[in-house]
């Protein structure tokens, strides 16, 4: 068979002659096979419906990315006997065209070239297909059209609505369930050794068939409840677990959780979401599962546990100290300096492999980069042992890390091969319901591991304005959660008794009033921010302005902590990119190879700070880019303030000169050269929660900590406190003054502010340590050791992002939250570092909220998000809440009450 690419083109005249000859043959064959030329009333009605369908197909095909051969306009739709034969003739010609020129939808995925035999065959010009090979005017669809669902060269990603079959292929939605399955991916033998196919075909990404969906829904609803608590023999279960090698006894609620995990692995789901509240023992329940449910297959025996970097050694210690030496598990840490570049066979010799999300993302990026290059090059394939290994069980700790399904880590987790899959997260839903889909996709929970079904049944209906649609979607969501998620909170009671006895937790909200001079400056900042918001919404949501809007939010929040945090970063000095004729001409002069390199980028990572960019700035003509903050540092002045076009600066990558008119942003680049792969990330940034977007901005703050502290040390004589810093000082002194030797955690999102708190503590002769993202793993470990073992160290200053997960800090019983965070789950996780199993003292939490500022509005946003999680996981109310939208954004800036 010849492939489509080998099919010889014909002249227009020859093509028309063949069409006419084929039409005459089809007409004769059609007439000879018809018992009567007069159509019945029912067939006439079907005829009209089909005619309308084809007319719509013709209309839609004009905008298709793959245009069909030109045809004259169809005859009249009036199904009379005089015009019927002409109409049939035109339709048969049309069907033959679809047969010989199949529609191939575009794809954003890069597939490995396959053999020509995998493509549908094209008949030669001399052969005339029989009437049986042409789709008739019935509701059925021929199995000879495999291309409408894509091929190995053009796979369709079912998670991307853009890749679904468009109407120009004339296949209707009702017929979609009867289409043939996609062609299989190319065999691994056709790939270079050591590579992973990037084909989007996966077992869970298949065409949706109603009968399969019904069957899968029935399977989903089976085994959806754990065994009743009072029917479990706790003593017998504990004996079984301890005989398997566990050194500690499980608490009653942990025995129940372990039993549920065992039952889920025995069901068709092969895993689930263990969503116990922070501090209830998800780790020990998982270790018990590893011991009691070991693999019997020596070729697939290894468990992969994916954690954050901060938890690597904690998991290793738990696996070492909680398991009897005679049953000890062999553990290998696949990360950093301990990584030995083992291949998949060597990894499969261990019982447990510990790795990190960043390591998975790195392997995914390396593999994609290799597959996107020419396979004929001599570049050796990268080592992707995690992707190549067949795992027995995969456990994602803090699984909400992959809640964004478009990140490299999430994509890599989905591609991993395993028999059983588990998600451990106390907050499986944080900002919106769509985050839960990423966990379902990893778990391959059918049928909702396909985005089109999840969106149709749950995601989109929850955003409806009709109460009945919302109620139905909420019921479906709760059934789905009940079938896949097992969750207990610290307030859960069994037989009218709490499942765990913890000391009481008291949360105190402390209102902070700005000083008069601070209030005047804050009002100035708010006015500038409001003008930016007005410009943003009045300019059709210009992406180039969106980054400035986020920065303005950041500055307002920083000001509430201390004016010095924004003293050198006023909104008026924001770095701006101008759209001018010179800029566009510079874009047009880009080298084609440079354009191709930019277009294939998967992520916008700044070449200076290596952080993801909200609005990257490209340098012409080299095509390298940085984030706006780094470019502002490079040029050393506010953009556009210079009277000359020359800026004395060098590209950080190639050391070429940077000229003012040679700086462009991604939106201008796209307007001239078309869509970029990486612009998908910019669109994603628009839909992400504010917490995720601002965390990118905050990473830059960590990089200037040392410079800020050095500068601050020289200005010690100019030291000036703030209203919030005064409140923190008074609260800490009151706790220490009680002389109970109680320790304190001080959380803040801003590392610069922690520098100010540190200086204040030094002035008060209070010993303290720090724990933030700027410190190495060894430095963090030293801080933890000092805080836990040195009685004189009473305070630990903790970055909210770095210290909100994985730590056990029950040595402290006071928590001070210096400012509110958009995502309340992050705050809850930070508090649970203290209020968890092992805590012996009452816990007090102080939440500082600056009065009549943006912080009060953030608290209001927090309430909505808490309500969302409550409705999804606990409540029976029917009022879902969506993600932050335009109205909430206006509300944050005080432009909407």
Swiss-Prot record:
Keywords, ordered alphabetically: ATP-binding, Cytoplasm, Helicase, Hydrolase, Metal-binding, Nucleotide-binding, Nucleus, Zinc, Zinc-finger
Protein's UniProt keywords contain Cytoplasm: yes
Classification of source organism: Eukaryota, Fungi, Dikarya, Ascomycota, Taphrinomycotina
Listed name of the protein: Uncharacterized ATP-dependent helicase C17A2.12
Stretches assigned to the Helicase ATP-binding domain: 263-446
A cellular component term, taken from the record's GO annotations: chromatin
One MF term in the entry's GO annotations: helicase activity
InterPro entries documented for this protein: Helicase_ATP-bd (IPR014001), Helicase_C-like (IPR001650), P-loop_NTPase (IPR027417), SNF2-like_sf (IPR038718), SNF2/RAD54-like_C (IPR049730), SNF2_N (IPR000330), SNF2_RAD54_helicase_TF (IPR050628), Znf_RING (IPR001841)
């Amino acid at each position: 068979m010849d492939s489509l690419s080998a099919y010889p083109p014909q002249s227009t005249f020859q093509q028309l002659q063949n069409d006419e000859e084929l039409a005459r043959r089809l007409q004769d064959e059609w007439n000879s096979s018809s018992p009567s030329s007069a159509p019945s009333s029912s067939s006439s009605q079907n005829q009209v419906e089909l005619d309308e369908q084809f007319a719509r197909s013709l209309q839609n095909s004009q905008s298709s990315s793959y245009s069909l051969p030109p045809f004259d306009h169809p005859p009249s739709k009036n199904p009379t006997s005089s015009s019927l034969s002409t109409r049939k003739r035109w339709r048969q010609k049309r069907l033959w065209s679809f047969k010989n020129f199949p529609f191939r939808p575009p794809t954003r995925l890069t597939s490995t070239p396959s053999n020509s035999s995998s493509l549908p065959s094209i008949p030669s010009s001399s052969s005339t297909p029989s009437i049986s090979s042409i789709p008739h005017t019935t509701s059925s669809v021929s199995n000879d059209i495999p291309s409408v669902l894509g091929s190995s060269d053009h796979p369709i990603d079912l998670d991307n609505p853009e890749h679904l079959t468009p109407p120009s292929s004339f296949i209707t939605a009702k017929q979609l369930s009867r289409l043939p399955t996609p062609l299989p991916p190319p065999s691994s033998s056709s790939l270079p050794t050591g590579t992973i196919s990037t084909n989007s075909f996966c077992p869970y990404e298949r065409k949706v068939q109603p009968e399969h969906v019904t069957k899968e829904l029935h399977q989903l609803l089976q085994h959806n409840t754990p065994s009743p608590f009072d029917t479990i023999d706790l003593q017998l279960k504990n004996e079984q677990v301890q005989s398997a090698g566990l050194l500690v006894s499980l608490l009653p609620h942990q025995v129940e959780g372990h039993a549920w995990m065992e039952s889920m692995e025995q069901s068709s789901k092969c895993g689930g979401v263990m969503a116990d509240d922070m501090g209830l023992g998800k780790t020990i329940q998982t270790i018990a599962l590893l011991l009691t449910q070991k693999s019997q297959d020596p070729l697939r025996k290894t468990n992969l546990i994916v954690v954050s970097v901060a938890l690597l050694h904690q998991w290793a210690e738990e696996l070492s100290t909680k398991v009897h030496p005679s049953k000890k598990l062999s553990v290998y840490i696949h990360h950093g300096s301990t990584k030995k570049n083992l291949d998949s066979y060597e990894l499969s010799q261990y019982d447990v492999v510990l790795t990190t999300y960043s390591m998975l993302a790195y392997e995914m990026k390396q593999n994609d980069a290799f597959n996107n290059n020419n396979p004929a090059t001599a570049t050796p394939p990268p080592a992707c042992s995690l992707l190549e290994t067949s795992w027995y069980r995969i456990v994602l700790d803090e699984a909400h890390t992959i809640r964004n399904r478009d990140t490299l880590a999430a994509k890599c987790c989905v591609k991993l091969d395993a028999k059983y899959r588990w998600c451990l997260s106390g907050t499986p839903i944080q900002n919106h319901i769509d985050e839960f889909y990423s966990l379902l996709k990893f778990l391959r929970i059918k049928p909702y591991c396909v985005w089109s079904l999840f969106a149709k049944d749950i995601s989109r209906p929850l955003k409806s304005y009709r109460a009945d649609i919302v109620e139905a979607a909420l019921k479906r969501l709760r059934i789905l959660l009940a079938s896949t998620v097992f969750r207990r909170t610290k307030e859960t009671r069994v037989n009218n008794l709490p499942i765990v006895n913890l000391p009481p937790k008291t949360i105190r909200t402390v209102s902070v009033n700005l000083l008069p001079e601070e209030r005047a400056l804050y009002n100035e900042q708010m006015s500038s921010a409001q003008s930016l918001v007005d410009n943003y919404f009045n300019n059709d949501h210009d992406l180039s302005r969106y980054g400035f809007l986020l920065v303005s939010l950041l500055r307002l929040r920083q000001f509430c902590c201390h004016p010095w945090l924004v003293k050198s970063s006023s909104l008026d000095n924001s770095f701006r990119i101008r759209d001018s004729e010179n800029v566009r001409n510079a874009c047009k002069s880009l080298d084609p190879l440079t354009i191709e390199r930019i277009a294939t980028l998967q992520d916008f990572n700044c070449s200076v700070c290596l952080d993801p960019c909200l609005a990257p700035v490209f340098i012409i003509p080299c095509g390298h880019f940085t984030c706006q903050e780094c470019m502002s540092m490079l040029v050393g002045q506010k953009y556009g303030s210079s009277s000359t076009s020359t800026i004395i600066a060098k590209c950080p990558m190639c050391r070429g000169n940077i000229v003012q008119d040679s700086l462009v942003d991604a939106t201008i680049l796209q307007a001239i050269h078309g869509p970029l792969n990486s612009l998908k990330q910019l669109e994603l940034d628009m839909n992400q929660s504010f917490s995720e977007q601002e965390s990118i901005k905050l990473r830059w703050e960590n990089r200037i900590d040392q410079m800020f502290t050095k500068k601050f040390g020289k200005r010690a004589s100019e030291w000036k406190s703030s209203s919030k810093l005064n409140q923190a000082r008074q609260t800490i002194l009151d706790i220490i003054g009680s002389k109970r030797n109680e320790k304190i955690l001080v959380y803040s999102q801003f590392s610069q502010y922690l520098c100010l708190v540190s200086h204040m503590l030094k002035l008060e002769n209070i010993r303290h340590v720090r724990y933030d993202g700027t410190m190495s793993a060894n430095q963090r470990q030293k801080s933890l050791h000092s805080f836990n073992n040195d009685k004189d160290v009473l305070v630990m200053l903790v970055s909210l992002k770095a210290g909100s997960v994985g730590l056990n800090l029950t040595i402290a019983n006071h928590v001070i939250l210096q400012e509110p965070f958009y995502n309340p789950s992050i705050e809850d996780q930070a508090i649970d570092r203290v209020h968890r199993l092992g805590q012996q003292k009452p816990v007090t939490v102080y939440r500082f909220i600056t009065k009549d500022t943006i912080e009060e509005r953030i608290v209001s946003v927090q309430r909505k998000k808490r309500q969302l999680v409550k409705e999804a996981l606990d409540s029976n109310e029917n009022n879902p809440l969506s993600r932050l939208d335009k109205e909430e954004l206006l509300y944050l800036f005080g432009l909407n009450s």
